[in-house]
């Protein structure tokens, strides 16, 4: 319950009279006001605390702390890609950029963590929320959130295109595709973010992270994001359908067993061989890229779910005549109870998205980095770090890889180490090695002057427990076989003529 103050003016409690506040500063479009007679009455800021209650902020903070725990996993992958050799990480520019996008995506990492330490003020005054122009924290967190969404969706689309080209069209991805993907994957999110910030902007709407404003959000952000996500999903499903088609074709195609003779024929089915080769090639590609395919499907499903949820939230909270008519019983309840939110919560639940759905979006946003770590943190990465630290501190085999076996003989008197010469013993010369190189006379008799091969016949020494002896070749010199009888006869079919 709220007490009356001078800012209520002629409006019933808990509403505040709009003309008692300055017309500039903060996000004016974020005010929730409705004309009542000759005045305009507004709900206090933040609006979410009235529609969902103060408990939503505590639950949203739990999702933020999940991101705090998952952020080191994302950083661990990026550091591994940068430090370890590729034989341990199997890094690829698609995976690296994808991981960078996930670190930014929907504030699941940095954008949720920064507000935990800063604790920005969500409201510019009692009825106006802060936006990117009045709050630096709002501009930073909102930009990271929306840039992460752009990057993840665009790189999901590029990974799907690469997978489709490799599987369905047998295209070998070279430098042209790499540079094209890098340009497309970074320029499109940058342009999309710039256009969105200029035309729409971000402001505090719920929680400590700024989200895109309602006006213009659909055409400036959600429609392009959903378009890329749906295109990636359709392309991914088409690729998987092609894989299933090739697999079924290789199972049920029996043309290779229709010949009556057991001998191979020149007229074997080329179509059967091609189908089986295509299946083996696709299987190899799937074995290499199943992690990326799985993560792309998870990301696309989450992005579509997020988009639908936020669009529903925008449509329900947008101050339109239809929404005001739906919210009229709730507004009347607040005026009758002097702003008792608990008593009016059943009326608010009739027009707002469910609280569980909104919290599910925040938790899923935080878990995206966890799925990325589970799928891309190969066991070889941990072996690579063990090898890295062993070589770093001199306990691994890599430190002795280029040490010569006779390095000790290059030194003089090794007893000088640790002051062993202080005993006064005379130094003795090390004995010369007993192994000597073959003499030129011996080497001259073992090589042929024509071609340098060994020309002397080796004398056969039969072992004591052997019952075999050298035998001359049994086959006569010259060709004793007819090549015509060793090849399979040609088989002719009626449709070959």
UniProtKB/Swiss-Prot annotation:
Natural source organism: Aspergillus fumigatus (strain CBS 144.89 / FGSC A1163 / CEA10)
Membrane-related topology note: Multi-pass membrane protein
Domain of life according to the entry: Eukaryota
Family under the similarity heading: Belongs to the G-protein coupled receptor GPR1/git3 family.
Protein name per Swiss-Prot or TrEMBL: G protein-coupled receptor gprM
GO cellular component: plasma membrane
Subcellular location: Cell membrane
Task performed by this protein: G protein-coupled receptor that plays a role in conidiation and regulation of the biosynthesis of secondary metabolites such as dihydroxynaphthalene (DHN)-melanin, via interaction with the G-protein complex alpha subunit gpaA.
Entry's transmembrane regions: 66-86, 98-118, 138-158, 179-199, 221-241, 293-313, 357-377
Knockout-associated phenotype: Leads to a strong increase of dihydroxynaphthalene (DHN)-melanin production.
Keyword Zinc-finger: no
Gene3D superfamilies attached to this UniProt entry: Rhodopsin 7-helix transmembrane proteins
Region annotation (Disordered) ranges: 428-497
Keywords: Cell membrane, Glycoprotein, Membrane, Transmembrane, Transmembrane helix
InterPro entries per the UniProt record, alphabetical: GPCR_GPR1/git3-like
Subunit structure: Interacts with gpaA.
Glycan attachment sites: 3, 259, 421
